[in-house]
């Protein structure tokens, strides 16, 4: 369901939000000292290039397909922070001709879950560019993505004077227990994960930032049935024409200035939107959940989510008789989970 637009912030609230934005920008600026350049190819960035910014840890399984996927869509350069990976992530990325790589051993949680580092890269290199801010387990689809690349999409958004594209994060899962089998590096994750929950999803517009809050779907159904308000936030603004004066507040779920949050109103909205296919539940999910639980670097209160990690370790079956097999963007548009907005 789509969210109604909340009333904008009053004068005092607007002033406080400006101060908050400046504090976030200052945090991002300071965080540059935590990043060590490993491979800098940013000199090749040309006007009009589409950039992708991400923070990763131990993503050697997903990265080969991820990089090829976004290259095909038209991404010119990837700006990546490697947060102390222990697998082949760093050498894999350093060998790519279109990747600029930084490394850090600093705390992911203390850096606002990597957002300070990503925000610095956006500030330094993204100004004036259409930029994607993504995790390695997110594949963006949008109307006509099988025939029109990101250049075509962003050109159309520019003509509409729309600075961002919103998206629903849609969890994909297997029909059997999670964590079973194996996935080869470079394999299409949709060969393993091809089911999803078509709903229900609910959307709420929050004051004073006018940010959207979408929840629902399979993780709420399976892991948070008694505490639905603790379930994951599913709305994002993953594609945006960046301005160095802007600041993401909570991942790319919300942003300042507040009016940018109105670019997306959730499932059922009429404005152009996409879907982030979330490939979290590949066979490595149980091992990753155990590591995340031990490292305590996710969630503001990691201890309160111990039950969530324990449930993943039990390798549950997420599939239900209401699950749908994923068929493509037209299917999701027909279900109201994305909109072409007249494109």
Give the role of each language-model region.
Residues 68-76:
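Short, acidic, metal-binding catalytic loop of nucleotide-sugar glycosyltransferases
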Residues 74-75, 127, 135, 161:
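Short loop/turn motifs at secondary-structure junctions
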Residues 57, 83-86, 96-98, 104-107, ...:
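An acidic- and aromatic-residue-enriched active-site/binding cleft used to recognize and process polar
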Residues 2-68:
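N-proximal low-complexity "stem/linker" segments adjacent to membrane-targeting elements
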Residues 76-84:
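Short beta-strand/loop segment that forms part of the nucleotide-sugar
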Residues 88-133, 141-147:
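Active-site-proximal specificity loops/subdomain of glycosyltransferases
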Residues 2-29, 114, 144-343:
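Catalytic-site signature of metal-activated, phosphate-bearing donor transferases
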């Amino acid at each position: 369901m789509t969210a109604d637009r909340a009333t904008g912030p009053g004068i005092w609230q607007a002033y406080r939000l400006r101060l908050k934005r400046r504090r976030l920008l200052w945090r991002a600026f300071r965080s540059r000292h935590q990043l060590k350049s490993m491979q800098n190819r940013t000199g090749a960035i040309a006007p009009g290039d589409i950039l992708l910014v991400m923070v990763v840890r131990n993503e050697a399984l997903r990265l080969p397909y991820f990089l090829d996927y976004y290259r095909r869509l038209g991404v010119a350069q990837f700006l990546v922070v490697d947060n102390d990976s222990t697998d082949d992530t760093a050498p894999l990325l350093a060998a790519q001709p279109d990747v600029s790589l930084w490394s850090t051993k600093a705390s992911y949680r203390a850096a606002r879950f990597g957002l300070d580092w990503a925000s610095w890269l956006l500030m330094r290199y993204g100004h004036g560019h259409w930029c994607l801010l993504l995790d390695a387990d997110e594949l963006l689809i949008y109307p006509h993505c099988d025939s029109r690349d990101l250049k075509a999409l962003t050109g159309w958004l520019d003509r509409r004077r729309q600075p961002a594209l919103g998206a629903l994060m849609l969890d994909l899962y297997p029909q059997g227990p999670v964590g079973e089998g194996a996935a080869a590096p470079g394999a299409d994750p949709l060969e393993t994960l091809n089911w999803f929950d078509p709903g229900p999803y609910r959307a709420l517009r929050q004051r004073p930032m006018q940010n959207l809050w979408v929840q629902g779907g399979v993780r709420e159904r399976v892991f948070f049935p008694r505490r639905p308000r603790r379930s994951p936030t599913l709305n994002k603004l993953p594609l945006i024409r960046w301005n160095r004066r802007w600041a993401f507040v909570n991942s790319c779920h919300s942003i300042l200035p507040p009016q940018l949050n109105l670019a997306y109103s959730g499932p059922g909205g009429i404005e152009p939107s996409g879907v982030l296919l979330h490939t979290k539940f590949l066979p490595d999910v149980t091992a990753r959940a155990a590591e995340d639980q031990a490292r305590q670097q996710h969630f503001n209160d990691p201890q309160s989510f111990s039950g969530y990690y324990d449930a993943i370790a039990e390798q549950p079956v997420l599939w239900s008789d209401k699950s749908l097999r994923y068929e493509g963007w037209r299917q999701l548009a027909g279900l109201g989970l994305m909109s072409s907005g007249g494109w």
